[in-house]
């Protein structure tokens, strides 16, 4: 049984096969409409979510399946003290696959060790968000035609930004990429992302606080919000909030074919005057999210693509490498 706990739970070839499956489903959804008849997805969301939870539910419904779950720990037995381990054991009796979001890093990994069905990490604290990473890869490939030999700028909250950590890990598997990490000193990329993702594959990366200086040299810009919910000190959050604000005037410095991605929600880091610029790709990401999550569900359930007769994952293999940082923080 396979789980999707972090991007590298799937090999690079499996990730590419997943992207290809999502492309086929977007182009021709009809053959996939009943592949999950009689199957149930459980969405266990201990933190607030709009896009991730609704797109997972939409994905399962579009495959012919059903959903159940909760949105908020206060609506579950977690409010009574039930552990993640027990919840995973219990819900395994009700569902065929679980998507879990949790504020504590490592919680979905822990759940996967006790569940009897596949577990998808739908975001665990500041650690990882692998399904969002697949959405980001799909969007970049659509816009740039490749996932290698790109200069990718990440801007904003790189310390707590789990989407940044996950996408960095995934893009590190592709040749010739260069990473530019743009943030205030207090929100720099965590050391473990460098030691686990960048350094083993000898990736070239730089760190800076100057977005304007880097814009002319980027192939892709990935913006993130400053995440208030990760701060213990309100004063520190207010000091850093608004440190980067991309608007149409600043975007004139960037290449004409540089897509702007954002995992959403945005606060004030991207002005609404950017929305009508053809480089704005963040609502493309939302659109792609349903098809990627449909593909993830089919892959984990081992359901063959009716157009190719093949499955995405090798279900004979064990779970791939899981980050040491994720383990140690549980």
Region spans (language model):
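Positively charged, low-complexity intrinsically disordered leader regions
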Residues: 1-54, 58
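Phosphate/diphosphate ligand-binding glycine-rich loop within oxidoreductases
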Residues: 34-141, 268-271
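Glycine-rich phosphate/diphosphate-binding loop of Rossmann-like nucleotide-binding domains
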Residues: 47-59, 142-223
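A short helix->loop->beta-strand "cap" motif at the edges of active sites that frequently abuts
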Residues: 117, 175-177, 253-259
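Rossmann-like adenosine-cofactor binding region
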Residues: 197-274, 279-280
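Adenosine-phosphate binding glycine-rich loop
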Residues: 257-258, 263-317
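Single conserved hydrophobic/aromatic residue that forms the stacking wall/gate
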Residues: 318-330
């Amino acid at each position: 049984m396979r789980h999707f706990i972090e991007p590298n739970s799937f090999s690079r070839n499996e990730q590419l096969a997943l992207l290809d499956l999502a492309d086929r489903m977007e182009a021709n959804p009809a053959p996939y409409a009943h592949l999950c008849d009689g199957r149930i997805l459980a969405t266990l969301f201990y933190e607030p979510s709009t896009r991730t939870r609704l797109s997972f539910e939409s994905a399962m419904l579009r495959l012919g399946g059903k959903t159940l779950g909760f949105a908020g720990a206060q609506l579950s037995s977690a409010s009574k003290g039930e552990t993640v381990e027990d919840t995973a054991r219990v819900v395994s009796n009700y569902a065929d696959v679980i998507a879990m979001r949790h504020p504590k890093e490592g919680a979905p990994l822990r759940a996967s060790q006790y569940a009897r069905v596949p577990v998808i990490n739908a975001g665990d604290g500041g650690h990882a968000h692998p399904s969002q990473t697949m959405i980001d890869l799909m969007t970049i490939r659509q816009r740039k035609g490749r996932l290698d030999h790109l200069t990718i700028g990440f801007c904003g909250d790189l310390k707590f930004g789990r989407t940044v950590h996950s996408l960095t890990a995934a893009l590190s598997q592709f040749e010739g990429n260069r990473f530019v990490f743009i943030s205030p000193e207090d929100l720099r990329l965590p050391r473990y992302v460098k030691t686990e993702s960048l350094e083993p594959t000898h990736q070239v990366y730089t760190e800076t606080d100057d977005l304007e200086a880097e814009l002319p040299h980027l192939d892709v810009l990935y913006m993130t919000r400053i995440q208030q919910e990760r701060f213990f000190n309100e004063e520190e959050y207010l000091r850093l909030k608004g440190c980067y604000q991309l608007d149409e005037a600043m975007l004139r410095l960037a290449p004409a074919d540089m897509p702007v991605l954002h995992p959403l929600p945005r606060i004030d880091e991207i002005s609404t005057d950017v929305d009508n610029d053809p480089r704005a790709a963040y609502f493309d990401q939302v659109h792609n999210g349903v098809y990627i999550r449909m593909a993830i569900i089919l892959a984990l359930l081992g359901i063959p693509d009716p157009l190719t007769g093949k499955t995405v994952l090798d279900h004979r293999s064990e779970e791939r490498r899981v980050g040491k940082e994720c383990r140690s923080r549980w």
